[in-house]
Design a protein with these regions (language model features):
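N-terminal domain-onset segments
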Residues: 1-120
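Acidic, proline/glycine-rich low-complexity IDRs
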Residues: 106-147
Protein backbone atom coordinates (compact mmCIF):
# COMPACT_ATOMS: atom_id res chain seq x y z
CA UNK A 1 0.00 0.00 0.00
CA UNK A 2 1.07 3.58 -0.51
CA UNK A 3 1.51 6.23 2.13
CA UNK A 4 -1.45 8.44 2.99
CA UNK A 5 -1.36 12.17 3.70
CA UNK A 6 -3.10 13.58 6.76
CA UNK A 7 -3.54 17.13 7.97
CA UNK A 8 -5.25 19.14 10.67
CA UNK A 9 -5.98 22.79 11.35
CA UNK A 10 -6.37 23.65 15.03
CA UNK A 11 -6.67 26.78 17.14
CA UNK A 12 -3.37 28.54 17.80
CA UNK A 13 -1.41 27.70 20.94
CA UNK A 14 2.06 29.16 21.51
CA UNK A 15 3.18 25.85 23.06
CA UNK A 16 3.48 23.66 19.95
CA UNK A 17 4.25 20.50 21.94
CA UNK A 18 1.11 20.97 24.04
CA UNK A 19 -0.91 21.65 20.88
CA UNK A 20 0.38 18.43 19.31
CA UNK A 21 -0.39 16.34 22.39
CA UNK A 22 -3.89 17.86 22.69
CA UNK A 23 -4.54 17.07 19.01
CA UNK A 24 -3.28 13.49 19.41
CA UNK A 25 -5.53 12.96 22.43
CA UNK A 26 -8.54 14.47 20.64
CA UNK A 27 -8.09 12.24 17.59
CA UNK A 28 -7.45 9.15 19.73
CA UNK A 29 -10.61 9.72 21.79
CA UNK A 30 -12.59 10.30 18.58
CA UNK A 31 -11.30 7.01 17.14
CA UNK A 32 -9.95 8.74 14.05
CA UNK A 33 -6.95 6.51 13.42
CA UNK A 34 -6.06 3.19 11.79
CA UNK A 35 -7.10 0.48 12.68
CA UNK A 36 -10.22 1.98 14.34
CA UNK A 37 -10.98 3.60 10.95
CA UNK A 38 -8.64 2.23 8.29
CA UNK A 39 -8.87 5.23 5.94
CA UNK A 40 -9.71 8.70 7.17
CA UNK A 41 -11.09 11.53 5.06
CA UNK A 42 -9.43 14.89 5.43
CA UNK A 43 -9.99 17.59 6.36
CA UNK A 44 -11.44 16.60 9.71
CA UNK A 45 -14.68 18.51 10.22
CA UNK A 46 -17.13 18.74 13.13
CA UNK A 47 -19.31 16.16 11.36
CA UNK A 48 -16.42 13.74 10.61
CA UNK A 49 -17.04 10.19 11.86
CA UNK A 50 -15.94 9.75 15.46
CA UNK A 51 -16.63 6.18 16.59
CA UNK A 52 -14.58 6.57 19.76
CA UNK A 53 -11.28 5.02 20.76
CA UNK A 54 -10.98 1.29 20.09
CA UNK A 55 -7.83 0.88 22.18
CA UNK A 56 -6.90 1.57 25.79
CA UNK A 57 -4.11 4.00 24.90
CA UNK A 58 -2.40 5.77 22.02
CA UNK A 59 0.55 3.43 22.52
CA UNK A 60 -1.72 0.38 22.13
CA UNK A 61 -3.26 1.85 18.96
CA UNK A 62 0.19 2.45 17.48
CA UNK A 63 1.27 -1.10 18.34
CA UNK A 64 -1.89 -2.56 16.78
CA UNK A 65 -1.45 -0.50 13.61
CA UNK A 66 2.03 -2.07 13.22
CA UNK A 67 4.00 -1.13 10.09
CA UNK A 68 0.98 0.59 8.49
CA UNK A 69 0.98 3.22 11.21
CA UNK A 70 -2.20 4.92 12.36
CA UNK A 71 -2.38 7.06 9.20
CA UNK A 72 -2.98 9.98 11.54
CA UNK A 73 -1.35 12.44 13.91
CA UNK A 74 -1.10 9.62 16.49
CA UNK A 75 2.09 8.49 14.72
CA UNK A 76 3.77 11.77 15.66
CA UNK A 77 5.15 11.63 19.18
CA UNK A 78 6.84 14.99 19.67
CA UNK A 79 7.95 18.31 18.23
CA UNK A 80 11.52 19.06 17.16
CA UNK A 81 13.35 21.73 15.22
CA UNK A 82 14.60 19.01 12.83
CA UNK A 83 12.62 16.56 10.67
CA UNK A 84 12.66 12.94 11.76
CA UNK A 85 10.40 9.90 11.98
CA UNK A 86 7.56 10.41 14.43
CA UNK A 87 8.37 14.11 14.81
CA UNK A 88 6.56 17.33 13.87
CA UNK A 89 9.03 19.98 12.75
CA UNK A 90 8.40 23.52 11.51
CA UNK A 91 8.25 24.12 7.79
CA UNK A 92 11.24 26.35 7.04
CA UNK A 93 10.79 30.04 6.20
CA UNK A 94 12.23 29.29 2.76
CA UNK A 95 9.61 26.60 2.16
CA UNK A 96 6.83 28.83 3.49
CA UNK A 97 7.86 31.49 0.98
CA UNK A 98 8.21 28.96 -1.84
CA UNK A 99 4.90 27.17 -1.29
CA UNK A 100 2.68 30.02 -0.09
CA UNK A 101 4.46 33.21 -1.17
CA UNK A 102 4.56 34.37 2.44
CA UNK A 103 6.33 33.63 5.71
CA UNK A 104 2.98 34.22 7.43
CA UNK A 105 0.48 32.16 5.42
CA UNK A 106 -3.22 32.26 6.16
CA UNK A 107 -5.34 29.14 6.61
CA UNK A 108 -6.77 29.75 3.15
CA UNK A 109 -3.30 29.92 1.59
CA UNK A 110 -2.30 26.60 3.16
CA UNK A 111 -5.64 24.97 2.28
CA UNK A 112 -5.20 25.89 -1.40
CA UNK A 113 -1.66 24.50 -1.63
CA UNK A 114 -1.87 21.12 0.11
CA UNK A 115 0.10 19.54 -2.73
CA UNK A 116 3.23 20.58 -0.80
CA UNK A 117 2.53 17.56 1.45
CA UNK A 118 3.95 15.35 -1.31
CA UNK A 119 7.42 16.67 -0.38
CA UNK A 120 7.20 15.29 3.17
CA UNK A 121 8.92 11.98 3.85
CA UNK A 122 6.89 9.02 5.05
CA UNK A 123 6.55 9.00 8.81
CA UNK A 124 7.37 12.71 9.04
CA UNK A 125 5.15 15.68 9.88
CA UNK A 126 5.43 19.45 9.57
CA UNK A 127 3.67 22.22 11.39
CA UNK A 128 2.88 25.73 10.26
CA UNK A 129 1.65 28.69 12.25
CA UNK A 130 -1.19 30.22 10.24
CA UNK A 131 -2.00 33.91 10.46
CA UNK A 132 -4.97 36.22 10.21
CA UNK A 133 -4.44 39.98 10.02
CA UNK A 134 -0.75 39.49 10.83
CA UNK A 135 -1.43 37.60 14.07
CA UNK A 136 -1.10 33.85 14.77
CA UNK A 137 -4.58 32.34 14.54
CA UNK A 138 -4.03 28.63 14.13
CA UNK A 139 -1.69 25.72 13.63
CA UNK A 140 -1.50 23.29 10.75
CA UNK A 141 -0.06 19.81 11.23
CA UNK A 142 0.41 17.70 8.11
CA UNK A 143 2.36 14.62 7.18
CA UNK A 144 2.51 11.27 5.48
CA UNK A 145 1.80 7.88 6.98
CA UNK A 146 4.39 5.12 7.14
CA UNK A 147 2.68 2.57 4.87
Amino acid sequence: MGAHPYYYFIKYQPDIEAALQDLRQREFEAGRYNPAQPFLRFPIRPDSPAPGAKHESIYEAIEDAAEDGTRSILDIETVSDWPDFGVASPLSEEDLQRYFGSKQPTKEMVSRKLDFLASIERGHCVYITVFESGQPSGLFFGGYSFD
